[in-house]
From Swiss-Prot:
It comes from the Eukaryota. Has antibacterial activity. Residues 1-22 form the signal peptide. This is Beta-defensin 25. It is found in: Secreted. Gene3D superfamilies: Antimicrobial Peptide, Beta-defensin 2, Chain A. It comes from Rattus norvegicus (Rat). Keywords: Antibiotic, Antimicrobial, Defensin, Disulfide bond, Secreted, Signal. GO terms for biological process: defense response to bacterium; innate immune response. Belongs to the beta-defensin family. It holds the Pfam family Defensin_beta_2. Disulfide bonds join C27-C54, C34-C48, C38-C55. InterPro entries: Beta_defensin_dom (IPR025933). One of its GO terms (cellular component) is extracellular region.
Length: 71
């Protein structure tokens, strides 16, 4: 019986999901992500409001009109 209780407690502890969103903040009209560092498949566009980098995938074209739309 003690083994079952230990197993249940272990599963509950390991299965805990922290509250809040783990996704990066979005920028460049939702096409970019605010990060500390851009990945190799991304390029730096501009700074986000929290001074992190707005990283945009190389597969997406950054048009001048997108930037004026907001952060």
């Amino acid at each position: 019986m003690a083994k079952w209780i230990l197993l249940i407690v272990a599963l509950l502890v390991l299965g805990h999901v922290p509250s809040g969103s783990t996704e990066f903040k979005r920028c460049w009209n939702g096409q970019g992500a605010c990060r500390t560092y851009c990945t190799r498949q991304e390029k730096f566009i501009h700074l986000c409001p929290d001074a992190s980098l707005c990283c945009l995938s190389y597969s997406l074209k950054a048009s001048p009109h997108s930037r004026a739309g907001g952060v």
